[in-house]
Amino acid sequence: MRKRIAALVSICLLMVCLTSFASARASEYFSYTAVYATALDDGEILIEYDIDPTHTMLECGAKMIYIYEGYNNKNFKVVDSFHMDDYPDMIQHDTIIGDGEVTYPGTPGKDYYALVGVYAKDQYGSETIYFPTNVVTAHN
């Protein structure tokens, strides 16, 4: 009986170790990503993104940014969007880093966050993953 329990525990530990190893890097394209929202003066909202790809990319940056507005941290709806086709500075070319920022003229007292589509492309393909920022309240 002890041998069976020991074998079962060993199998469980092996599965946990393999699962942790397999999910350590879930992306072929991104080794690090971060997205932030900051409330600036006069209601302005700053959205920043920072991307470290796994290797040199043909293109890297934000593919799409959706700005959400709500009140009392509820009832959020999309009020604006930024797309890389309209804002080419959102993408860097032939790079090992992708970072940038956009601003939105918010209304003091309202809450904002963004959904940022981080993007990387190499000669074999591309990947886009969407991450939400923190919620901030616009102020004067």
Sequence positions of predicted segments:
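Short, surface-exposed binding/anchoring microloops in extracellular/periplasmic proteins
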Residues: 30-69
